[in-house]
Design a protein with these regions (language model features):
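Extended C-terminal subregions enriched in glycine
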Residues: 269-276, 280-303, 307, 312-315, ...
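Conserved active-site "lid/cap" helical segment
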Residues: 1-91, 98, 102, 165, ...
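Conserved catalytic cysteine-centered active-site region
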Residues: 2-9, 58-150, 154-161, 199-223, ...
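Condensing-enzyme catalytic core mediating Claisen C-C bond formation in acyl metabolism
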Residues: 1-27, 36, 182, 213-277, ...
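Beta-strand segments within the central parallel beta-sheet cores of soluble alpha/beta enzyme folds
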Residues: 45-55, 82-87, 111-116, 179-185, ...
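Active-site-proximal alpha-helical scaffold in enzymes
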Residues: 87-117, 159-193, 233-239, 348-368
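Acidic, glycine-rich active-site loops and adjacent beta-strand->loop/helix elements
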Residues: 15-17, 55-59, 88-92, 115-121, ...
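Short glycine/threonine-rich loop-to-helix capping motif typified by GTGT followed
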Residues: 59-67, 264-267, 300-323, 335, ...
Length: 398
């Protein structure tokens, strides 16, 4: 099958420093990541004619939004034929999907795509306390959007909302806390091999259960770690592929569908949510099957989300992710389906979806160092998002 996706490759990847409260601006971190990705792709700054980001500065959430595309365009003095940024779409991957669409349409040859967060610094300042609150004219702020149905009930966080989904999964399918723990323990085991990871100390099952409950059934280690950092990728037209001395990742397919009710707490299937629709759409756009995938980098803003994606993408049956990951053997680096090989957001840090893309490309190129999957992966699946917000990406080594 040949679709618009397969006209695109990921020719380069780059990251800034990643850490807790680095004290650097989002733009500063973005430029570091961008220049690294451009160099990795064998390009010059002048070759970049497209720019995409998520969510863009317009989201106006301190630490979360990152610099907008006009800021980066100005800082790098780019001459753009196309640019994009926005919050509403198939999760964080929408920036990559938009870039692939632009390349497929001939609007750009080389698109710089980036995601930048300074959440660790801003949370230390109390900078995200107002997220979801409307108003702004003084007095008592008013809730807006979907949060008007959650904040009055003191459900301030996605942890609260997604815990309900996890509880439903536990109830419907007999999923256990011991099974859920394997996502966090596997992530930490892989992070120990990643020099950029935030948390690298070993974690046992006893350590996991000793951590405090955040919102049942999620414990502290089920929740990802806020960080400061930026990740950039270069989406290039395959016909204009730069000459590089490493393999590149071809974009095989994207999954962007949303067919259920766009609600965190009123979705028609509370156990899979938007992952169900995005994953189903992904497999209609490729001749590849789940059995062809060698490594998976699945969103783990909360550990349960990786389980949702395993089911939605067809790596196990609906309701069977608990037994599938039990003991952690199948999802280990040397298992049948290595999962979140860099440590995921649980241990490597919340780079808000883009860390998974970066890691998938490194694995396909055989450049992941001590955490490299020994079998030499040829196909990787990447998934972002939770609740009604979801996007999936299939990459192959070219």
């Amino acid at each position: 099958m040949t679709d618009f996706e397969q006209r695109s490759i990921i020719s380069g990847v780059g990251q800034s420093a990643i850490g807790r409260r680095l004290g650097r601006s989002g733009l500063d971190l973005t430029i570091d990541a961008a220049l690294a990705a451009i160099a990795d792709a064998g390009l010059a700054v002048a070759d970049i004619d497209g720019l995409a980001t998520y969510p863009g500065a317009g989201a106006a959430m301190p630490g979360f939004s990152g610099p907008g595309s006009p800021d980066v365009q100005d800082a790098l003095r780019l001459r753009l034929n196309w640019h994009s940024g926005g919050l509403e779409g198939p999760a964080q991957l929408q920036a990559v999907v938009n870039a692939v669409l632009a390349v497929g349409a001939g609007l750009a040859r080389h698109v710089l795509v980036y995601r930048t967060v300074t959440e660790a610094t801003e949370q230390g300042r109390g900078g995200r306390q107002g997220i979801g609150l409307g108003g702004g004219g003084g007095g008592v702020p008013r809730m807006g959007g979907s949060m008007q149905w959650t904040i009055p009930f003191r459900a301030y966080s996605a942890a609260n909302w997604l815990a309900m989904n996890a509880q439903r999964h536990f109830h419907e399918f007999g999923t256990t806390p011991e099974q859920l723990a394997m996502i966090a323990i596997n992530a930490r085991r892989n992070a120990a091999l990643n020099p950029k990871a935030i948390y690298r100390d070993p974690m046992t099952l006893e350590d996991y259960f000793a951590s405090r409950i955040v919102t049942t059934p999620f414990r502290l280690f089920d929740c990802d770690a806020p960080v400061d950092g930026s990740t950039a990728v270069i989406v290039s037209a395959a016909e204009h592929a730069p000459a590089v001395d490493h393999p590149v990742a071809r974009v095989e397919a994207v999954g962007t569908a949303l067919r259920g009710r766009p609600s965190w707490d009123q979705f028609d299937d509370m156990t899979t949510m938007g992952a169900r629709d995005a994953a189903a759409a992904l497999w209609t756009r490729t001749d590849l099957k789940p059995a062809d995938v060698d490594v998976v980098e699945l969103y783990d803003g909360f550990s349960f989300l990786s389980m949702c994606w395993l089911e939605a993408l067809g790596f196990c049956g609906v309701g069977e992710s608990g037994p599938f990951i039990e003991g952690g053997h199948r999802i280990a680096l040397d298992g049948e389906l290595p999962l979140n090989t860099h440590g995921g957001q649980l241990s490597a840090g919340r780079l808000h979806g883009f860390g998974f893309i970066h890691e998938a490309v490194l694995q396909l190129r055989g450049e992941a160092g001590d955490r490299q999957v020994a079998s030499g992966p040829e196909v990787a699946a990447v998934a972002n998002g939770g609740g009604p917000v979801a996007g999936a990406l299939l990459l192959s080594r070219l």
